[in-house]
C-alpha cells in the first residue's frame, strides 16, 4: 500500500504517505492496492480511447465509464473491494473492446497500430489474490527509486488533480452534460500519466492543462444544475430538526435528492440535506418541495456522531463516507453511484423505496426544535445581479476587501484558523465561502454592509466557478487584472477535488492564494518553492500575520 492523496496522510521523518495495513482514512491496504490497479487499467483504457479517436472511433459508453470508475478511487468514496474489482474487470473488457476496434480500423486504413504502453498490456489475474500481486506494478509511486522526488511529486499532482476533474465530469454527466472534446482531452491526459513521464516541464504543463480542463467541466456542471433546477436564489435555511419521519441526503448529487423528494411526496417524511448538499435548498426546483425542511449537521468529518443521532435513513450520493459501524448506523445508511462500504445496502437504479421503507420504520424526530436560520444561495446568477451594487460600495469605500474562505473541512485542530480569519476579517470586508469548509463559521452572524450580507455562501466546492465569474466581472468593472482586485483567496484543502480547483485557479493566472492547514504531502519543497515563485502560492501562517500582510498593515 502507498497512498498520499489526502490531507490526513501519515507524515514522518522517514517519509510521507500511508503504507501500512490501513490508511488514515480507514482504507485497508487491499482496498488501496485494488484501487491502484483499477487506475492502472483505466490508464490503459484511456490510452486506447485516445488512439481510437485518432482514427475516428469514439465510444461514448467508455467515455462515461472511465471518469466514473476513476471517481471511485477518491478519498472516502468506495471502500468495497468487490465493487472495485468489478470496476477493474469491466475496465479490462472495455480496454479489449477498444483495442480490437482500433486495430481493425488501422488494418482497414492500412496503417500501423501505435506501440502500447504498460497499462495497455496487463492481463488481469482471475482472482483477488492475483490482482493484489499485480497491484505492485500499479502503485502510484512506482519507480520512486529511479526518478527524482520532484518528478514523482509532479506525477502525483497531475494524478490527483485529474481525479478531481473526473469527479466533476461524473457530477456533470448525471445532469446530461457531456462533451466529446472534454472526454478526449481527459483520455489524453490519463494516457500520458500511464507512461510515467520524467519530463518536469511537460508534467507541470499537464497540471495546468488539467486545471483548464476542469474549468470547462465546472462550467458544464454549472449549466447542468441551473438548467435542471433553476438558478440558486438567496434563501433562508433552517438548521434545526422538524418533528416527523426523516431522510438525510449527503454527498453532492442534486439529481438523487430530486428523485428522493419526488418519491417521498405525500408520505409524511421530511428530507434534510447534509454537508455539501446544503446548497440544494437554494435551487427553485428543489426548494419548492415543502418536505425539504432544512439542513442537518455539518461537514463530512462529523458524520459518525451526526448520523448516529439522526433518527432516520441516510443516503450517501457521493463522497465523503467514513465507517458507519462506528456509530452503529450501518443498517440505515445507503450508498449510491460510485460510493461503497462493505455490508451497506447499495441502491442501483432510481428506486429509493428501500430508503423510504427504512425511514418509515424508524422513529424520526419527536418534536420541533427552535429554528435557526442561515442564508445561502449566492451563486453565479445572484452574484452577477448584485455586482452593480457591490461595485458602488467598493467605489464609495464601504467595501474595502473581499475574502474567499472555503474548500474542504476536516478535523485537525489547526482548521480553527479558517473560523478565526473569517471572524477577524475587518468589518468593511465581504466574505465569500464555498465547499464544506463553510461549516467552520456559516452559523455565525456577520451582519451586512449597506444591505449586502458580509457572508455570501456561493455553494458547493465546484461553485468556485461562480466565484471566478464574480472576480472576472469585478476586474472588468474596475478595468484591472484579477490579481489587482482587493481579493484574498484562503482555501482549505483535504482531498482531490480541492487539488483540481486549486489547479484551475492557478491555470487561470490567479495569484497569491493561501492554502492550509498543511501543504499536500506529495508536494516536495522544490515544487512548493516553484509554485510560490510562479503564483505566490503560500501556506497559511497565523491569522494576525496573514491579515496584516494582505491588508498591508504595518
UniProtKB/Swiss-Prot annotation:
Cofactor(s) needed: [2Fe-2S] cluster; hybrid [4Fe-2O-2S] cluster
Keyword Cytoplasm appears in the UniProt entry: yes
Annotated signal peptide: none
GO terms for biological process, alphabetical: response to hydrogen peroxide
UniProt superkingdom: Bacteria
Keywords associated with the record: 2Fe-2S, Cytoplasm, Iron, Iron-sulfur, Metal-binding, Oxidoreductase
Residues annotated with Cysteine persulfide modification: 408
InterPro entries: HCP/CODH, Hydroxylam_reduct, Prismane-like_a/b-sand, Prismane-like_sf, Prismane_a-bundle
Cofactor, free-text remark: Binds 1 [2Fe-2S] cluster. Binds 1 hybrid [4Fe-2O-2S] cluster.
Location of the protein in the cell: Cytoplasm
Protein purpose: Catalyzes the reduction of hydroxylamine to form NH(3) and H(2)O.
Stated name of the protein: Hydroxylamine reductase
Source organism (scientific name): Shewanella pealeana (strain ATCC 700345 / ANG-SQ1)
Lineage, top ranks: Bacteria, Pseudomonadati, Pseudomonadota, Gammaproteobacteria, Alteromonadales
Gene name per UniProt: hcp
